[in-house]
UniProtKB/Swiss-Prot annotation:
GO terms for biological process: viral RNA genome replication. It comes from Carnation mottle virus (CarMV). Keywords: Nucleotide-binding, Nucleotidyltransferase, RNA suppression of termination, RNA-directed RNA polymerase, Transferase, Viral RNA replication. This is RNA-directed RNA polymerase. InterPro entries: DNA/RNA_pol_sf, Rev_trsase/Diguanyl_cyclase, RNA-dir_pol_PSvirus, RNA_pol_HCV.
Amino acid sequence: MGLPSLLVEGVIGCTLVGGLVAVGSAALAVRATIGVVEFNRECVRGARRIVSSGGRCLVVQSPYGNPNQGLIRGEDEEIDNVEESTPVELTPLIEVKAEVDGKEVVVSKKRVVNRHLRQRFVRSIAIEAKNHFGGDISPSKANYLSVSKFLTGKCKERHVVPAHTRDCVSAAMVLVFTPDVHEIRMMAGLASDAAYGIKIAMASILNRKGWCWRLMVNPLDRARWWEMWCVVNGFDSNKPVTFPKXGGLFYLNGVETKIRRGGHPSVIEVDGQCPLKERKLYVQNAITTGYEYRVHNHSYANLRRGLLERVFYVERNKELVSCPQPEPGSFKEMGYLRRRFHRVCGNHTRISANDLVDCYQGRKRTIYENAAASLLDRAIERKDGDLKTFIKAEKFNVNLKSDPAPRVIQPRSPRYNVELGRYLKKYEHHAYKALDKIWGGPTVMKGYTTEEVAQHIWSAWNQFQTPVAIGFDMSRFDQHVSVAALEFEHSCYLACFEGDAHLANLLKMQLVNHGVGFASNGMLRYTKEGCRMSGDMNTALGNCLLACLITKHLMKIRSRLINNGDDCVLICERTDIDYVVSNLTTGWSRFGFNCIAEEPVYEMEKIRFCQMAPVFDGAGWLMVRDPLVSMSKDSHSLVHWNNETNAKQWLKSVGMCGLRIAGGVPVVQEFYQKYVETAGNVRENKNITEKSSSGFFMMADRAKRGYSAVSEVCRFSFYQAFGITPDQQIALEGEIRSLTINTNVGPQCEAADSLWILNRKYQ
């Protein structure tokens, strides 16, 4: 192909392209002209519709409707027909009187619900929710779940049917998460020029310059010269009044009971005149929920009242009376359960003294080593079973009861404990497993972590279609353990040890107790038949055994028991509530116990077991102590803070234990984290754990939790359990992080109570 041919083809191509461009331009011009004509035509039609409809056609209708505009404006919607009602098939049946064939009869008809009333109801529950959750609520998942649960509960209280409940809750949610006129006015007031001026005035007063500066600025003001004269003569300059921030470390002296009443012929009293030795309770009050704790002194007055009111008598109608006794033959009825317990538990033999000593550590191990060595030289004697009584060093809440009867501890000699421990120490775990099998699942919650306890409760809860939990415990369980109850308990042990004569002799010493209690200002000597002595080796085992078997004997229905001594929770079907409540109180009274049944609960988080509630953290369940109690109780120490280092060591021990059992839990993990941060790099003192060998430290022994982010699901579950809203949780955590615990020991002062949201006085 030559050059002329290329030129010819180029000319032809350009001509064709130019023609196509021209045709396209003409087509666009024609379409634009048509579009202008169509637009003008639609404008004319639109103007005609606006004029003919009076402007109503301008309102854009949502495909889902917009029923909440009137609610948000706070006004009722205009309804053409006031009698218009909700769909008939969604309303409940009601019984009304009607006249049929001249006779008045009762007929069922659908309730008519006026939409004006619906709107007022929606606004009413929305206002209740705003008041409960504190006004403007952040749009988090936890808050959404909490508000939805709250609104649904309000509808259930008014017996709203499920279809209407869904409708009302969805409408009220819009109002709750939308600022109302009151919140707008509040924020407008806070942002006003007047409020700004007041804040500036306050800041200027609090940030006053020194007296020298004020004198130079106003040299002709006689007040400035008089202030200088006062400063030169040793007085303070004129400064704004400030109040010292509460917080720091101090101690409280032990308390004496103010009540002295009663007496018993089996108690010999010797009131001495020696000076009293006071106990001390150490406190940090920078972070508190308002509860105050004290500790009883080991004194004659406390010892006397503790023995009389917790061992010999019970209170009824504000009078001291003898403990109730079981009905004759009541424990014989449970012979079949003893035989079943023996079959499941099997036969056992005692362990060696060395094996028993190996079960302990620290100071207690040394005591039992010496006792075991003495038994090699001298056999067990009757006097080894005598009791040595003292007042328990226990923190008690003065806000709940200002002057309770002190608790007494009544241990027998270490020699007796070694002999009895050789039988029961290792056997105890087999006995718990036997009780589990009798009840059909984990029952005795001894030795489990908080996660394991909660998981066992959750498993028991899921065994029922409509579960309900009924908590119950026995008032002063140890005091109500009669001779008949002890004999039944002992028969269970003897059956498993094939009637061992030495064990029978040891257990017989518990039927008639001889004890003495010494204090610095007096002493008491007494004899008591029956009653559980709190220092016995078999206290925990015996209480669990009696509680589980008596409850099993009383409950002839399908149920599950969660037990820890005298603290019990029974889970069953809702249809069996009346049977359980009626049989618990009357049934336990036949065995000489005073059973107190709590209100049934229908939600997992509402269960209370050992002063803890189940909380779901997003991955699993765990038991959480009530923050109102734990955050105040864990601010008080029975371990002496002799110096700042001891105080920090205690803070570190408590903080680390708290994080191990409550890591990832709202509010409380920040509380324990603040303890750890305050302690800094102080060396851990393991002796503190031994001195504070309480349930708190024992719970943390096998726990493996730690500080972690709090999930939205956990915040919702925490709200369900303790009523602290998610926004309040976040606010409390921020408050705790901003606080500083002063570890210098100072004078006694009132608690800071900075976490007032948790304080029951304000709820």
